Amino acid sequence: MAGKRTQKINEGVDPTKLYALSLAIGMVKERAVAKFDETIEVSMNLGVDPRHADQMVRGVVNLPNGTGRTVRVAVFARGVKADEAKAAGADIVGAEDLVEIVQGGKIEFDRCIATPDMMPLVGRLGKVLGPRGMMPNPKVGTVTMDVAGAVKASKGGAVEFRVEKAGIVHAGIGKASFDAKALEENIRAFADAVIKAKPAGAKGNYVKRVAISSTMGPGVKIEVGSVTASPTA
């Protein structure tokens, strides 16, 4: 049954064809038929080799229409900054006590923020948070004195991205329940951020391929120009 269901979902998607962004979004939404609200993911193949330091691509983008998911945020801070984080809606706030919790393997959050003075302490968690992509970093705004702003951004649609070994960068940019216009705006915002993060060491064609998919659906390849160009309407 599962095989037949997959075959039916894949019908009408030509894996060798490149589709215009608006058409691709419609195709992906039509095929998101699971019993839950599937995440829509965009994947970009870049002409970089992240093994070289001058070809690393990473950054953060605030999606105009949010991600549609609940993001749990942990903040390492003390005193007034801890109070500000709590007031802004942080789910977990602490210092040494939070370090002990994380070291114990209890990671009940999706994003981690820290004030600069906390980094010597948070640095002990590199082996735990690093592999999960959660280590606070000033380059993506998660090491900051503006903890309230960082918490609100994280919960409001901020998405971190980092190129992987094969030169691929991807992210969930919304839900299948989003209307097509909202998804298109989010995809363009993500693509713009990746393009702006082009490293100095990148040579030749930077954006090689773009595709979108839903959690359970097939990947739909997109004409690169229809993603990187400004919409006409």
Swiss-Prot record:
- The source's superkingdom equals Bacteria
Any coiled-coil regions, as ranges: none
> Which PANTHER family does the record associate with it?
54S RIBOSOMAL PROTEIN L1, MITOCHONDRIAL (PTHR36427), LARGE RIBOSOMAL SUBUNIT PROTEIN UL1M (PTHR36427:SF3)
The record's function comment reads:
Binds directly to 23S rRNA. The L1 stalk is quite mobile in the ribosome, and is involved in E site tRNA release.
Keywords, alphabetical: Repressor, Ribonucleoprotein, Ribosomal protein, RNA-binding, rRNA-binding, Translation regulation, tRNA-binding
- List, alphabetically, the SUPFAM superfamilies matched: Ribosomal protein L1 (SSF56808)
Q: Give any single GO term for biological process.
A: translation
**InterPro entries in the record, alphabetically?**
Ribosom_uL1_bac-type (IPR005878), Ribosomal_uL1 (IPR002143), Ribosomal_uL1-like (IPR023674), Ribosomal_uL1/biogenesis (IPR028364), Ribosomal_uL1_3-a/b-sand (IPR016095), Ribosomal_uL1_CS (IPR023673)
**Molecular function, one GO term:** tRNA binding
Whichever gene encodes this chain, its name is rplA
One Pfam family hit: Ribosomal_L1
Q: What's the protein name? A: Large ribosomal subunit protein uL1
> PROSITE patterns from the entry?
RIBOSOMAL_L1
Quaternary context: Part of the 50S ribosomal subunit.
Q: Name one GO cellular component term.
A: cytosolic large ribosomal subunit
State the family it belongs to.
Belongs to the universal ribosomal protein uL1 family.
